[in-house]
Amino acid sequence: MIGFGWLEALLRVGRKLFVKPETQLYPEQKPKLYPRARGRIVLTRDPDGQERCVACNLCATVCPVGCIDLAKAVADDGRWYPEYFRVNFARCIFCGFCEDACPTAAIQLTPDYELSEWRRDALVYEKHDLLISGEGKVRGYRYWSVAGKAIPGKDKGEAEHEAPPVNLKGLLP
């Protein structure tokens, strides 16, 4: 017994021949990006032009694939800054956890998603590649004016409404 399924398939293909294709030609037609699209990681500066990053290492800790590497250094005024800051975009999954974990809004994700390179080692970005001249998405935030600096002449426990630190060795028998 011969069915007519082949005729139905032929008619279906014939109808699709005259319909506009849904495929977008990528380099000529860019896809629509949504406002919260996550792309390349950048390091921002505060309004004074200083680096916002305090090298707290929260971004590297929260990263699920471990693509962020940094080392802390201390400036003459006691301010922490990253001696080096390295992001391996070959491993990055652009989850945005690093942006959420950053207490100073220093690390931000931009909508730049075109990161293709011929060599894999070219996808390892150093601090000078990541640092931008502007403030990014968070404008006017000065972390160092509200936190992070030692008060001259006041040690721990000497500020107003602050209890002195507990001596743990004094609690031992």
Swiss-Prot record:
InterPro entries: 4Fe4S_Fe-S-bd, 4Fe4S_Fe_S_CS, NADH_quinone_OxRdtase_chainI
GO terms of molecular function: 4 iron, 4 sulfur cluster binding; iron ion binding; NADH:ubiquinone reductase (non-electrogenic) activity; quinone binding
UniProt keywords, alphabetically: 4Fe-4S, Cell inner membrane, Cell membrane, Iron, Iron-sulfur, Membrane, Metal-binding, NAD, Quinone, Repeat, Translocase, Ubiquinone
Biased composition (Basic and acidic residues): 153-163
Region described as Disordered: 153-173
Cofactor: [4Fe-4S] cluster
Subunit structure: NDH-1 is composed of 14 different subunits. Subunits NuoA, H, J, K, L, M, N constitute the membrane sector of the complex.
Matches recorded under HAMAP family: NDH1_NuoI
Protein name, entry field: NADH-quinone oxidoreductase subunit I 2
Organism: Rhodopseudomonas palustris (strain ATCC BAA-98 / CGA009)
Gene symbol of the encoding locus: nuoI2
